[in-house]
């Protein structure tokens, strides 16, 4: 059966170090729970899949080594805004802080193959039994004709137009950056400014507040954004 015809319980595998994740995916292939390929952290293609999935998306975030543990809770918090997240961690990693950050489950990545597959499949079943969607898609549908042509801008647009809760600029910088470093605040400001310029001729703008060195994005709004309305 062709790879694209297979439906997996997991929507996307995100890796903080793809070459270390590849052996895990090969080992798990016979269990039919994980896609055959992973995406790097910050992949616009991966986020696009998550943002357009009809049911609640499920992401496996693979953390191949202890060098990635510092600040991992911030990554989980940001990613959990667009997907349910199962985190595969090195042995002896404390799960409590990751669960508090929004992880649906935290599993040692050296868990026996069948047990790991069962726990991931159980997470998918639990998501499917939930009655309420994780995030509303009404705004994304309403503003679909306004989506930019550039793919990276499309992802930012989709994130903000389908937001079910406010986005802190620090979370966006982390989500849109690489495994090694987040996107700079200046780069995010430039990207959101370009998006705003595209939306304004249609009477739409980003809804946001800026205070104490932190910008919080709420979504899209008809008319000027919060900062401009307050001037």
Residue spans of the language-model regions?
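A Lys-centered signature of the CheY-like receiver
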Residues: 109
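Conserved acidic segment of CheY-like receiver
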Residues: 2-42, 59-63, 86
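Conserved phosphotransfer microenvironments
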Residues: 21-22, 43-83, 87-94
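DNA-binding patch around the recognition helix
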Residues: 130-151, 189-231
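Receiver (REC) domain switch/active-site region of two-component response regulators
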Residues: 112
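Alpha4 helix (beta4-alpha4-beta5 surface) of REC/receiver domains from two-component response regulators
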Residues: 90-105
């Amino acid at each position: 059966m062709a790879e694209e015809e297979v439906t997996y319980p997991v929507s996307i595998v995100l890796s903080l170090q793809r070459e270390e994740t590849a052996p895990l995916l090969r080992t798990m292939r016979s269990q039919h729970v994980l896609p055959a390929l992973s995406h790097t952290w910050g992949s616009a293609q991966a986020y696009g899949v998550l943002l357009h999935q009809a049911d609640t998306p499920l992401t496996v975030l693979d953390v191949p080594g202890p060098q990635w543990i510092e600040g991992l809770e911030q990554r989980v918090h940001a990613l959990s805004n667009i997907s349910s997240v199962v985190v595969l961690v090195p042995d002896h990693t404390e799960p409590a802080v990751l669960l508090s950050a929004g992880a649906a489950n935290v599993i040692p990545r050296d868990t026996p193959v069948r047990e790991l597959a069962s726990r991931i499949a159980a997470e998918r079943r639990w998501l499917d039994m939930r009655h309420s969607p994780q995030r509303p898609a009404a705004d994304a549908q309403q503003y679909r004709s306004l989506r930019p042509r550039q793919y990276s801008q499309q992802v930012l647009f989709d994130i903000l137009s389908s937001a079910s809760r406010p986005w802190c600029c620090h979370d966006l910088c982390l989500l849109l950056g690489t495994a090694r470093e987040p996107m700079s605040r200046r780069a995010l400001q430039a990207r959101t400014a370009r998006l705003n310029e595209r939306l304004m001729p249609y009477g739409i703008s980003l809804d946001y507040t800026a205070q104490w060195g932190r910008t919080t994005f709420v979504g899209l709004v008809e008319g000027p954004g919060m900062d401009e309305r307050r001037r």
